[in-house]
Amino acid sequence: MLEGSNGKLLVYASRFMLDRKRLESVSVAAEKMAASLNLNFEVVTFGEKTSPIYVYYKKGEEEPIPLYCDKGGKVNMQDVCAALRNMMFVLSFHPKFLALKQMRREIMQFS
């Protein structure tokens, strides 16, 4: 699949993150959604010592769109899946994201 065809989900997290379980829950949920929608998936680490984990949708060279932010605490993979599904569904109505509009049914089936 070409990188820019349908877009990709990006998980941004600090490389200094101490709670690997949080990162795993968020990244597994994002990877699962990416696979179900035929999107690319990537985990991006950065050097700042911050605890939030972010998930973005990126289409081609356009600015990434934030979908999810985990600021700490308990992370339930099902809650992350639901949040990603809801945000992707909302984005599917934006005229800029026609590829998501065509995937709306798959987005709503994701859980």
For the regions a protein language model found, what residue spans apply to each?
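Non-catalytic, surface beta->alpha helical segment in thiol-disulfide oxidoreductase systems
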Residues: K58-R104
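Cysteine/selenocysteine-centered motifs that mediate thiol-based redox chemistry or coordinate metal-sulfur cofactors
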Residues: M1-L9, H94-S111
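Auxiliary Fe-S-binding modules of radical SAM enzymes
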Residues: V28, V44-F46, M108-F110
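Local sequence-structure signature of Cys/Sec-based thiol-disulfide redox active-site neighborhoods
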Residues: M1-L37
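Intrinsically disordered, low-complexity segments enriched in small/polar residues
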Residues: L2-S5, T45, K58, D70-K71
